[in-house]
Structure formats: C-alpha cells, structure tokens
Amino acid sequence: MLKNKNLLATIVALTVMVIAALFLTQKEQNNSSNSTEKVKIGVLQFVTHDSLDEIYKGIKAGLKEGGYITTDNLEIDFMNAEGDQSQVQTMSKKLVDNGNELLIGIATPAAQGLANATTELPIIMGAVTDPVGANLVTDLKNPGGNITGVSDQTPVADAVSLIKEITPDAKTIGVLYSSNEDNSKIQVAEFKTAAEEAGYAVLEYAVASSNEIAATVEVASSKADVLFTPVDNTVASAFSTVVSVANKTKTPIFTSVEDMVEGGGIASVTLSQYDLGVATGKMAAKILDGANPADTPVQIFNEGTVVVNQKVAKELGITLSDDVISKASKVIE
C-alpha cells in the first residue's frame, strides 16, 4: 500500500514538473515571438545626393535612439524616386499599400507625394522648408492632421553676412535654384530680401531640370560676382556641373549645405543634414510610441554653422580672413 502511495506521489510530481516545463517553454516562445515582431515603416527619398543621403542615415540613427532598430524590431520599406515626380506619386501609393504603419518623406516633393496618397497613416516630414506653404500642415505648433516632422530653414541673413565677409567687393549675387521645388522658391525669396537690404543686386536663375544647369550657370557666372544656391535637390544632384562651369570664370559659389562646400563651394552657413535626420527619426519613434501627429509640433532647424573650403578659396585667389576661419566649425583644406 505504501509503495502504491509513493508511486502515486511520484507520478503526480512528475506530472506537475512536465506541466510547468511546458508552460515555461510556451512563455519563452511567446517572449521570443514578441521580441522579434517588427514594426514596418515606409521611407520615400526624393532623389539621390549627399544631403538627402545624410538625412536618411540620420533618420535610422534617430529611430535607433528611440528604440527602433533594423536588426531587431524595425523593417524599413525604402524607395527613391530619383527626382522623377511621376515616380513620387507611384511610390507613395505603393508605400501606403505595402502595410506600413508610418511613412517618412525626405524633402518636400516626397512629403507632398505621401500626403496626396493618404490622410490616415502618420507621415513624418524630413527637410521641408515651409510645411504650411507646401500645404502639408495648417500650423507649425498644431499641425492638425496626420503629418508632422522637421523643417529646415536656412539662416539667410547669416548667409548674406558671410558673403560680405569673404567677398567684400561683390555687388551682384546670382541665385541658382529649381523652379519646380517650392522649398527653394521660399528660400530664394527670403534670401533676396536679406541680400537687397544689405545693398546687393540679386539675379535669379531658375532651372526646370538638371539638364539646364550647365547653360544657366554659364550665363549666371558671367553676370554675377558670386553665386548662391539654397537647399535645393535639383541643384545638389548636379552640383559637380555647377562647380566645373563656375570655375571657368573663377566665380565663387556659396551654398547652404556642408557637402556642397566639400564638393567645390567656397563657404556655407550650413544646417547639419545628419542631425536633421536624427531629429526626424526620433520624432518618428515618438509617433510609433503613440504620440498624435496632429498635436505634435513641427521641429524647426534654423541654427547654422559656418563651413569654409580653404582649398577652393586659394584656387579662386580669395583670402579667408582670420575672423572667418575662427568662426568656422569646419575648414576644408
């Protein structure tokens, strides 16, 4: 009888252990499943060039800071329209249809394409100069819809001051930009006001596509003492052409982003495109965590730093003063 009782106790104990083991195994499987479950987001980049590429790098870093990592819990559905507006529309629709939980548009045309494709999915703007003017939000502090993000606003008054410091004898500034980019038109209008207030004559040179850049720069560099280009995707994508043509007349080019100074511009009051991307990624993470785009204020990036290219200055016969060098956050030799 005692043996039977011991046998029964053993069987019960073993049964409990088996059930417990099965429970723990199931729990571990559930935890493992939860840890590998990925959030899927769509990213649309307007065109390939260094500035927008840096923004995309920053976006991934910002998402990582916010807890969303591509090797763990994040899947990015990335598309690049390569400057083709028809592709912007096609890709925007694809990103909406692909089951993404959130969308990010890098540059104004990309953000506008996504906005036209959905009013339901949250959209984060990356590098949109005038979100209100681009009809993406109704108010910067209270966007009011499914869109918020980060706005880059070139400090044009500082840019004019830098031109005066580096080329004090210049009287005429030629401004090169794309006629198809709303953000560029806004920057040009603001720059023109600041430059004219400082006593400069401003000549505008708008191009409809990168195919027109060489001929346009040839005319501009023959008539203007210096050239200026805002944050402009079309110009940036063909900046090597701008430099090669302007160098024929030794016309200095002032830009609005660092990589264009590295690519042959003389100087810039620049916004960090990478940092702008980081801010965009962190905001995307915030929305994924449950924040509402409608009441998430648009973040403004407008504090620039000076970057100069000493090598280009020497090639153009321009001496950069000690004051200019001392205020520069980066000097390219």
Regions found by a protein language model. Name each.
Residues 59, 148-196, 297-312:
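An alpha-beta-alpha
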Residues 75-97, 206-220:
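Structural motif
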Residues 286-333:
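Hinge/cleft segment of the Venus flytrap/periplasmic-binding protein
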Residues 131-170, 271-291:
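Hydrophobic alpha-helical segments within soluble ligand-binding/sensing domains
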Residues 40-60, 66, 77-86, 180, ...:
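Extracytoplasmic "Venus flytrap"
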Residues 1-40:
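Short, low-complexity disordered leader/linker segments with a strong preference
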Residues 113, 119-156, 253-267:
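Flexible loop/hinge segments that line or gate small-molecule binding clefts
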Residues 80-138, 229-247, 251:
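Beta-alpha junction/loop-to-helix N-cap segments that form part of ligand/metal-binding clefts
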